[in-house]
Amino acid sequence: MHLRRTGPAFGRGLALTLLLCAGMAGQANAVPSFARQTGQECIACHVSFPELTPYGRYFKLTGYTIGKAPLTKEGFNFVPLAVMAQASVTNTRNNNTTDPDTGDTVPVNQRNNDLVFTGASVFLASKVTDYFGGFVQWTYDNLASNADGHLVGHSGIDNADFRLVGRYSGADAEIPELIYGMTLNNNPTAQDPWNSTPAFGFPYTSSPLASTPAAATQIDGGLGQQVAGLGGYVWWKKMVYAELSVYHTANNGFAFLRSGQDTHTDGGVAAIQDWNNPYWRFALSHEWGANSAMIGTYGMIVNRYPSNLDTSTATDRYRDVAVDAQYQYITDPHTFTAQATYIDERQSYNASYAAVQDTGAGIGAGPTPDNPTDTLKTFKLKGTYYYDRKYGATVAYFSTTGSADAGLYGMDADGNARTPNSNGYIVELDYLPIQNVRLMLQYTAYNKFNGAKNNYDGSGRNANDNNTLFLNAWVAF
């Protein structure tokens, strides 16, 4: 049995992490590949990775094609590779829980208060021509778990985005009046230039060892690194942005977009109907002085098979509709940014519910709903302040609410169907001794977790038992 360690062990982990960071900072004397490509510092594109500045959004929507290519007729210019690594310490407020099958006391977090190497990523990121560019990220997750819950190292593709772009300029225009392009990506919203959407939204880094709420919408990570999306977009005078894409299971010729995923286990990966999963995005934005603002909407219809191993069945239908907004004030030395998003998902279990009614069980890995339709709603709000792009503080609120469904979420101690309702807040402090090293202290607190404030699992565990203190060191070079 894993025994919970108290304050002194966490203090030792903190000290070790800071020493490790000091060593990393000494080695991080090169900047990532896009900075080498453009000749700009990282802060030109990022408030703090991955939050984009107005210039960063322009760089992304022009297909990552600003600057020089790694290889031109004049010769070799730079290596289009970047590396990111993280180390961390996680403290779970109450690290003991009861195994529902055996009644034994077991740890929630197998490495509570330990200094761990979290993982690392390699980025192939570059302009290829004046009209084509992109990036692909390969990640090693040192804290991935297997079916038995044991920690095992695992690597696979992360976010990928490839773009083909064009530009139209009037006779006297200093910058293109119209940017248009196509994107191929493997995670809905990863192609979006604002940080109010899920793929690159806050929290940008969180503990992989912490307990998290069970329910999330499809567009909020449910399809990442499992699908292939192909679409087109236009951006007019930096004010009007519109995109329409369609998604397909990342198989056959697109299989590289889900490399490393478990495609042989039922439930190991998503399977969606061929190209019958539209994604849309519309946003109005404005820049004036040091300010920029955006208000928009995005969404997706997902027709998903209950089992990725059987695509002969009907599909469950998920309709996600979202609204979002962002504001940035960027000066030297003060920077303030804020993002908000609200996602409304309507779930129609056209395949799964029928199977439950007919056989008493779902199809394959499920889901196994008790209701023919459900809802799931997510709200996120975040504000960040940076001084001199070196000292940062963020406060965020998050909430998920949805239909009570015993088939999906179980029953509470009183015999009522549980809900997915969870909410809480995050407080984060950041310190960047140099622009490609970030030290972070993050505290996540839950007011409600998986449907209840107290005894949410029927074994006496409360929502605030999952409160998490997370110390993280991040370096890119």
Annotate each language-model stretch with its function.
Residues L19-A28:
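C-terminal segment of classical bacterial N-terminal signal peptides
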Residues N29, V116-A120, I157-D161, Q225-V227, ...:
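Transmembrane beta-barrel architecture of outer-membrane proteins
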Residues V31-E41:
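Sequence/structural segment immediately N-terminal to covalent heme-attachment motifs in c-type
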Residues G39-F49:
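The canonical Cys-X-X-Cys-His
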Residues E41, V437, A463-F477:
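Outer-membrane beta-barrel "beta-signal"
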Residues T53-P54, L81-N94, P107-N252, D274-A290, ...:
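Outer membrane beta-barrel
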Residues N96-Q110, S145-V152, F202-A210, G253-Q273, ...:
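Solvent-exposed loop segments that connect transmembrane elements
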Residues A290-V427, Y431, Y443:
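Detector for outer-membrane/organellar transmembrane beta-barrel domains
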